[in-house]
């Protein structure tokens, strides 16, 4: 009799996070978007080879695109496809969501950035956010509040 081999998959895992965005912006609203990817990109994402730093969302012809994100190709990638690490990737959002984001981005001071990329089942999802930039004194205040919360938790724990 053969024994069944149990393979554990991490389907709910985070692939990449944009910690810089959480530091530099006030997050107003979050959205979940799918991504249109090529085969070699999915293989690289399974290996966790993605960087969201310096990336943002652009809108062109009523569609949303992820610009500036890097997906590093694996060394074992297909030889007949030339991988481009910083390719602009189309985001899959509903027309209502695109309209909502586009209307807010056209207002002064608002921007749209990716926060995280993760697996949802067998699909790759991108968490994007409508954000407003922080000034230097806002960053200092946020850091001061975070330090106070940490100290308060440390005092309460004793």
Swiss-Prot record:
PROSITE patterns from the UniProt entry? SSRP
Q: What is its main location?
A: cytoplasm
CDD domains in the record: SmpB
Asked if the keyword Hydrolase belongs to this entry, the reply reads no
* A single MF term (Gene Ontology): RNA binding
Q: State if RNA-binding is listed as a keyword.
A: yes
Can you supply a Gene Ontology BP term from the record?
trans-translation
Q: Which Pfam families would you find in this protein's record?
A: SmpB
Annotated keywords = Cytoplasm, RNA-binding
Q: Which GO terms describe its cellular component?
A: cytosol
Which compartments is it annotated to reside in?
A: Cytoplasm
The family database entries (InterPro entries) matched by this protein are listed as: SmpB, SsrA-bd_prot, SsrA-bd_prot_CS
Q: Which family, according to UniProt?
A: Belongs to the SmpB family.
Mind telling me which NCBIfam families this protein's record contains? Answer: PRK05422.1, smpB
Q: Which HAMAP family match?
A: SmpB
Its function, per the record, reads: Required for rescue of stalled ribosomes mediated by trans-translation. Binds to transfer-messenger RNA (tmRNA), required for stable association of tmRNA with ribosomes. tmRNA and SmpB together mimic tRNA shape, replacing the anticodon stem-loop with SmpB. tmRNA is encoded by the ssrA gene; the 2 termini fold to resemble tRNA(Ala) and it encodes a 'tag peptide', a short internal open reading frame. During trans-translation Ala-aminoacylated tmRNA acts like a tRNA, entering the A-site of stalled ribosomes, displacing the stalled mRNA.
Please give the name of this protein.
SsrA-binding protein
| Organism expressing this protein natively | Acinetobacter baylyi (strain ATCC 33305 / BD413 / ADP1)
